[in-house]
Amino acid sequence: MPKPTKGARLGGSSSHQKAILANLATALFEHGRIKTTETKARVLRPYAEKLITHAKKGDLHNRREVLKKIRDKDVVHALFEEIGPFYADRNGGYTRIIKVENRKGDNAPMAIIELVKEKTVTSEADRARRVASTKKAEAPAEEAKVEEVVEVEADTADDAAAEVEGAADTADAAEDADKKD
């Protein structure tokens, strides 16, 4: 059995609240970010995230469920073809609310609600770790190559000692140049 939403409604009646949320969600999916009151943004956030979750599933049933709430077919098409697949590997947290200064006329607290366009923080951290580990792996490999070259080119012990000293000086100069950069 349907139960009414608890708490104050945006705009008075429940039908007006549904219309406000549908219009706000349409604007959010169309523009990527909207500026509204903080209360409307907080109510819109779970509403929009549920619609994005439907879009991630992408089947006909979920498309019809979204069309019950959002009447603009172009926005629904963009939601299912662009927004849903973009968040395919993300489990929730599709929107972000940023508080901004109060509205000039009535001093209402305002906020910007936007779709998160960055990939997850963990994937960025994993990429940074991979880059750091490859840099660490490359540094010892370069030193090993210098030693191998010295061993191959030396024919006698005296030549080897001179070449090792020359290679060490070259390696020190290269390290100093890297530190300056």
Swiss-Prot record:
Residues 125-148 have a biased composition (Basic and acidic residues). One of its GO terms (biological process) is translation. Gene3D superfamilies: Ribosomal protein L17. Residues 125-181 are annotated as: Disordered. Keywords: Ribonucleoprotein, Ribosomal protein. SUPFAM superfamilies: Prokaryotic ribosomal protein L17. GO terms for cellular component: cytosolic large ribosomal subunit. It holds the Pfam family Ribosomal_L17. Residues 149-162 have a biased composition (Acidic residues). GO terms for molecular function: structural constituent of ribosome. PANTHER family: LARGE RIBOSOMAL SUBUNIT PROTEIN BL17M, RIBOSOMAL PROTEIN L17. Part of the 50S ribosomal subunit. Contacts protein L32. Belongs to the bacterial ribosomal protein bL17 family. This is Large ribosomal subunit protein bL17.
